[in-house]
Regions:
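N-terminal secretory signal peptides that target proteins for export/translocation
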Residues: 1-8
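Bacterial N-terminal signal peptides
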Residues: 12-24
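Short N-terminal segments immediately surrounding and downstream of signal-peptide cleavage
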Residues: 29-47
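Amphipathic beta-strand/beta-sheet edge segments enriched in Tyr/Trp
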Residues: 33-39, 117, 210-255
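C-terminal/domain-edge helix-coil "capping" segments
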Residues: 53-70, 112, 119-134, 171-174, ...
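N-terminal segment of the mature soluble domain
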Residues: 56-79, 137-198, 207-214, 300-313
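Signal peptide-directed extracytoplasmic domains
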Residues: 78-144, 151-156
Length: 313
């Protein structure tokens, strides 16, 4: 083996090791060339005006809206809702139609859509928008509702936020929640620490479930004003959130659900902030590979295509 070829091989190995090390400690790394949105349900009246291309275009639009809700902060996704269908179609890498059927003169189907990840990231970056990787996470949430007037803690079975939390899920949500079981001991721990509830960690409750990712949600209700304090611990990152909600009745399920969805969106934004793919900082690296070694070149190219942190090569 010649000296120059040895150097090329050493550089190649060094470069791959560098990428692997960076990727191992970064939430920005993803091993996929596409963003995949599955099981988009479509339905259209089947009559003389039926046009399958237009139906699929609607599915692309719907899939795109779900995607941007998954990977963009709330304030940014509204900017892109007006993206025209031709622009959206330019990002589509492929799609598959499933379960096509006709029911009562209606065409129904499910569609999976693959969007080109690098094209989308570059498009968003050109608009000054940072994307996040799609990374689902299981989180235990402990919603504690307190009536300040009565100095009363609601049991889980009487807490509308507890009862309705998992009834308000959206397809773009990446956080999968689970709640504790009704337990007299939990209630006793909460009541014991009611005077310092925003500072107490409630590890006695969380540790029973052996959970790493957790959210403490404290809701203080007085005269239809709800003061909310949230302490999030996601992948060893501690974050806090304080909000107020006015004119929320504990008897109005629609208002309760609106608060739940708003909080879930805030938690999604916090989680996305930990998974940002920031390619705005450009660090040029020169790498030489033997063009005659097709297998080596092909493997390297495939690997580079899969790394979000590499914008161009």
């Amino acid at each position: 083996m010649t000296l120059s070829k040895k150097i090329y091989n050493y550089l190649y190995i060094f470069f791959l090791v560098l990428i692997i090390v960076i990727s191992e400690f970064s939430t920005n790394f993803a091993k996929a060339k596409t963003f995949v949105i599955n099981d988009i349900e479509i339905q259209e009246k089947y009559d003389l005006n039926f046009n399958k291309i237009k139906v699929v275009d609607k599915a692309f639009k719907k899939a795109f809206e779900i995607l941007i809700s998954k990977i963009l902060q709330s304030e940014n996704k509204n900017i892109l809702r007006s993206t025209d269908i031709n622009q959206i179609k330019s990002f589509v890498e492929g799609f598959s139609l499933m379960e096509e059927k006709f029911v009562d003169d209606n065409y129904q189907a499910k569609i999976n859509v693959d969007f080109n990840k690098k094209d989308l990231i570059n498009y968003f970056n050109s608009k000054g928008i940072i994307t996040s990787s799609i990374n689902s996470i299981d989180v235990m949430i402990l919603p504690i509702l307190i009536d300040l007037k009565k100095n009363q803690i609601f049991s889980y079975s009487n807490n509308p936020f507890f009862l309705n939390w998992n009834l308000n899920n959206k397809k773009f949500h990446q956080i999968n929640y689970f709640l504790p079981n009704e337990d007299i001991e939990d209630f006793s721990i909460i009541r014991k620490n009611i005077d310092d509830i925003e500072n107490y960690n409630f590890n006695e409750i969380f540790n029973k479930y052996n959970v790493k990712n957790r959210i403490l949600l404290v809701l203080l209700n007085q005269d239809n004003l709800i003061k909310v304090f949230s302490k999030l611990n996601l992948e060893n990152n501690e974050m806090y959130l304080n909000k107020n909600y006015k004119d929320v009745s504990m008897k109005n399920l629609e208002q309760i659900n609106d608060v739940i969805l708003d909080l879930k969106n805030d938690y999604e934004n916090k989680w996305k902030s930990l998974n940002e793919i920031n390619t705005s900082i450009i660090l040029p690296i020169r790498l030489s590979v033997d063009a005659n070694n097709f297998l080596l070149s092909n493997n390297l190219e495939n690997y580079l295509n899969e790394v979000d942190l590499i914008s161009n090569y």
